């Protein structure tokens, strides 16, 4: 299988400063915006108890975190089963779950090993009726029972360099799931490094929220087989 790399998509010029701009940009109904507003409130409150996100990013919450997460949905609007690895404070998984709450049979699996963050995710899910299942464990533990979980999409944000990320996601990507991973300015270098371990198809979608960032769409993952030497 040959590696294939393409770049598609367009960036949005104006940052999203609040719920009204978010609703306009993503065509979101009022009740969904109310859920995101509640999420924002709980995140601000929770930040005083646990280090959920970088405090300096809170003033740009709607653009830096919410819009950055929501942009992934345009690449898989009909996917019903998602898996967010290293969910942290819920980006991108919890945002997508809130946006898709009214879609039948939708579920977002959130994997997070830190108990305080799991408690926060559960609090937001209750407050917003987000269709999520929280797995408070290490990704490696969940992957041992990977056959019982069959996601359409595997996603992650700021979790690990791509070679390690693909190792973590491999149990699901090798079973046919697509990967949608948010990456920054080093995306190209990470792809080249990952190619030393894996064969895969990769589409680069320019981020809507940052000029030097991308969404990597990865499929057809297979481990590279080293040629035998005589």
Residue ranges and their predicted role:
Residues 92, 171-173, 197-198:
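Glycine-rich, phosphate-binding/catalytic loops in enzymes
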Residues 70-156, 166:
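Conserved SAM/SAH cofactor-binding pocket of Class I
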Residues 134, 184-230:
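Active-site capping/gating segments
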Residues 117-119, 162, 187:
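Short alpha-helix immediately C-terminal to the canonical SAM-binding loop
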Residues 2-79, 83, 116-131:
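Class I SAM-dependent transferase core
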Residues 166-176:
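A short glycine-rich, Lys/Arg-flanked "PGG" loop and its adjoining helix->strand segment in the class I
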Residues 43, 96, 183, 218:
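Residue-level signal for inorganic ion chemistry
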Residues 176-186:
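Conserved beta-strand signature within the Rossmann-like core of class I S-adenosyl-L-methionine
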């Amino acid at each position: 299988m040959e590696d294939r790399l393409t770049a598609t998509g367009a960036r949005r010029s104006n940052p999203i400063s609040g719920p009204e701009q978010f609703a306009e940009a993503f065509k979101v109904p009022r009740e969904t915006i109310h859920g995101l507003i509640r999420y924002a409130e709980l995140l601000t409150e929770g930040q005083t108890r646990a280090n959920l996100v970088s405090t300096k990013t809170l003033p740009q919450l709607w653009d830096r975190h919410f819009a950055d997460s929501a942009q992934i949905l345009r690449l898989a609007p009909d996917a019903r089963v998602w898996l967010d690895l290293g969910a942290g404070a819920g980006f991108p998984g919890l945002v997508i779950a809130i946006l898709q709450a009214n879609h039948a049979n939708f579920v977002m699996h959130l994997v997070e090993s830190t108990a305080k963050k799991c408690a926060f995710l559960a609090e937001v899910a209750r407050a917003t009726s987000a269709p999520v299942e929280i797995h408070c464990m290490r990704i490696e533990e969940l992957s041992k029972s990977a056959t019982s979980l069959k996601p359409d999409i595997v996603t992650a944000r700021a979790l690990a360099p791509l070679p390690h990320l693909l190792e973590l996601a491999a149990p699901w990507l090798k079973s046919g799931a697509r990967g949608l991973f948010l990456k920054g300015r080093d995306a190209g270098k990470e792809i080249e490094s990952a190619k030393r371990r894996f064969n895969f198809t990769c589409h680069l979608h320019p981020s809507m929220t940052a000029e030097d960032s991308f969404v990597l769409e990865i499929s057809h993952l297979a481990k590279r087989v080293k040629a035998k030497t005589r």
